[in-house]
Amino acid sequence: MLIIKFRFISFSYHFYSVICSWEKEKKDSRNSNNDNNSTKIETEPLSLWSDFDNDGPKKIILNYIKEITDESGADYVPKEDRIAVFDFDGTLFQETDPTYCDHKLYMYRVFNDTDYKDKATDKQKEAANTIKYYADIGKLPPLDLKTAEAMAEVYKDMKVNEIYEYTKKYIDQPSDGYNNMKRGDVFYKPMLELVEYLQKNDFIIYIVTGTDTYVCRAIVDGHMNIPESHIIGTETIIISDNQKDKDGLDYKYLRNDTLQFKGELISKNLNMNKVYYITKEIGEIPLLSFGNSGSDSSMAELALQNPHGMAFMILCDDIERERGDLEKAKSFEESCNKNNYITISMRDDWKTIYGENVTRKIDS
């Protein structure tokens, strides 16, 4: 029914318009409910999250949002103070396919990129072989400053805009361990749904990650509605292509200059460094923190310094839909319980991970 709204003062006509509009909305709603299109928008908040546990993370999050958005309540938090920080790998995006995406990109650069592999140094090859060794046995490599430095070095002289396209081209290939999915599509659907739900409730979202900032921005693009300035990752030195060996204090950027990587690491954004970058780039203590490992505990502790703060950690306990690790998940859950972090079980709290059409490859 088409309703033309005239700006009359007449109360009776206005009331008639409202009733007709309401009837149209009911009809549209019924038609929408009868639509079998699998891409329809779910109206239920966090519909991809399980309801099996009344005390589970879904109920905790929904109740929390209700409390902090109630302007008449004691726990109301103004919109400008609603900040949530998310780790990336293992929190929003898969880290076991079979290892971190930026690590796989690094191995490709060293082992397979015909424009670079012959230039790779012994240090870079050693770091790539270490990453490959752990990936082959289904483990994540230990945190290693030497590896982080090597990962910065391989992009020396690459333009900033080039690494974006370089990453995009790599992640546009089929997933290594899953059917019906590309490398860049391995986002956890329940977490994407959570981010959108928080945004609808006026949360400002930041990604605080150990992945290189520029690589992460390329991966996130097209999947999440998050500004590039809100993606805070591992930091490397950026220079002008005409700067050569001059310090930034001794060089003035020119209109025809372009930005490129110097190939030097500034800081790997893990542990206390996450707190540093949150303080430096955001300037406020977040309300919510989401992570999946001990390297996220520092920003979790920071969030818990907020009077209304909460910290959540994801457990890698799904060994059917994901490449989980039950022993690791159990140990981490015990640690989370001791520190009052709320745990999210990939196995129990998510109805799906990547979508029903995505399956693990037999040999993965």
Feature roles, as predicted:
Residues 37-247:
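Alpha-helical substrate-recognition element adjacent to the catalytic core
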Residues 40-48, 161-364:
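C-terminal cap/substrate-recognition subdomain and adjoining C-terminal extension
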